[in-house]
């Protein structure tokens, strides 16, 4: 049954994405913020399909920590799920991503319309300069910036190398950082066809002020909070089936 439900979800996305990508292209003349709201509605539909077809819901802890001003999100990366859910949990945002994602037919077209910071991971300091310049521009235009410091999806229970880019941007623009931990990989793993029913937990930490910090120091502080929170989740065994109370509480977010 799980395989069938997962296939239905995949098939639904395959049907939905091409026409929605064409809609995304038609939003080009619109102001950037309005364009974002139209395009990001795709993620709301995808999360609804995920809930109805696969039984995956989510809960958010620490919502009171979300600032009211543009912020840099540094988050754990385990799944494709967070790229959908963050659009619904947080204010309008752009992502730092590998440039090759923009070449994916249909999906890449929609991503390009959202003005991401698309970098060449092998470019070294040139990539840092690009992130700093474009990141400052996006922040000044009122957008949040989402960065996955590990750079790629990491299996549950494992930790990737935390890249310095997000901390570098924060310290060079004086922008606070919001650390995010979650366990989405327990339900929708990297390249996994099966989507396991249950409740994904998203934990939002207190904002971190980068004032008087070196990038490396800030990066270590972010990693310590995220990985500490991941350990707490694993010890608490937060992988569980959805309860009616939790499901009802999250309906407005999916």
Protein language model features and the residues they cover:
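Generic preference for hydrophobic
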Residues: 60, 73, 95-96, 202-204
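Non-catalytic C-terminal accessory region of glycerolipid acyltransferases
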Residues: 128-254
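Glycine-rich helix-loop-beta junction characteristic of Rossmann-like nucleotide cofactor-binding loops
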Residues: 62-66
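A hydrophobic membrane-anchoring feature enriched in long, contiguous, low-charge segments
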Residues: 4-29
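Thr-Gly-centered strand-to-loop micro-motif
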Residues: 61, 96-98, 119-121, 149, ...
